[in-house]
Amino acid sequence: EVNPHFIYNTLNSIRWMATIQHAPGIAEMVTAFARLTKSISKGTQKLVPLQEELALLNDYFTIQQYRYGGDLEIEVSRIEDDRLCRDCMIPRFTLQPLVENAIFHGLEPKGGHGSVLLDISTDPATGDVLLRLTDDGVGMPPEQVAHLLDEPAEGAEKAEKFRHVGLWNVNRRIRYSFGEGYGLTIESEEDVGTEVTIRLPYQQKGDSHAADTACGR
């Protein structure tokens, strides 16, 4: 097993070499990748403030932007209240796999160009936090959407199973952390796009219920 410090030191060396060779793009991408790698090493069960999750998403986008150039847009289109980003807790690496799905299964089939927009608001009826990820990709038929959150079948095609596992796992982690009333809902229309809504409780860092449910109590 490779020592994580060796990986981080190597990435820092690459960043330093890129800087002195006046290659800012490489330096920026390596910096983003190093931060993502450190976050991955911390695991996915821990609850983090939404603003920390958004920072991870920004690092992921930095890397993908260099891959796709100006053809890809990922943007937080609206934040209803800045306090949501500071106070709302979310399982680490919830947004990144959903955005990855939107890119590889929604935008790539139409040439890798398009947008993924994130809207952050509250449900006026319940006070829950709603994160809506909308892409303008190829979309999906209703019969496919209906089973996306089911537990993946063993015989599924590799690419579809990868997508299915990612969505199912994110939904499972949210429900494990907060209860069955929370998680993902998915709406999609072929040739129009897909919207994934994440429902979370509005609970601040250190909230006893969030801590209890995260520990399975």
Predicted regions and their residues:
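Two-component histidine phosphotransfer core
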Residues: E1-E187, E195
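Intrinsically disordered, low-complexity acidic/proline-/asparagine-rich linker or regulatory tail/stalk regions
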Residues: A210-R217
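Short C-terminal beta-strand
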Residues: T194-Q203
